[in-house]
Amino acid sequence: MAYQTVNPANNQLIKTYPAHSDADVEAALQQADALYHSAWAKGDIEPRLAVLHKLADLIDSRAEELAKIASQEMGKLIKQSRGEVKLCAQIARYYADNAKLFLAPVKYPSELGEAWVEHHPIGVLLAVEPWNFPYYQLMRVLAPNLAAGNPVIAKHAS
């Protein structure tokens, strides 16, 4: 079964996308799992933060284009779409700037000895998201998990 994107303002077909086969889904899961087990996910956080900074810069550089796409596909006012795009760049930049602090080990006083909390990647995350805010719904899951080293696979809610 194919998926179609239709402009809700005029019912014009924008594009048809093929459905993913079971093999496609399995391949995506395997790639995400390989990334989770890689040095990229488990190693130093700096490369992941650099990706988030680059993502924020790319969103900013193409903000108007992204806003127009969201408005055309979702039937949203362009002002709302611009706000959503701007928010997504801010979210990516926020985690790029702060995740190192958020994920740093935290020591706690204890009468029984040393105690601390460490943060480590937990694995591949599957995000089933509504698409009424197509960029924001993904970014709010992607940015913190990318910083933490957790690959994310997203699927729209059906």
Predicted regions and their residues:
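N-terminal Rossmann-like NAD(P)+-binding subdomain of aldehyde/semialdehyde dehydrogenases
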Residues: 1-113
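Conserved small-residue-rich beta-alpha loop and adjacent elements
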Residues: 105-158
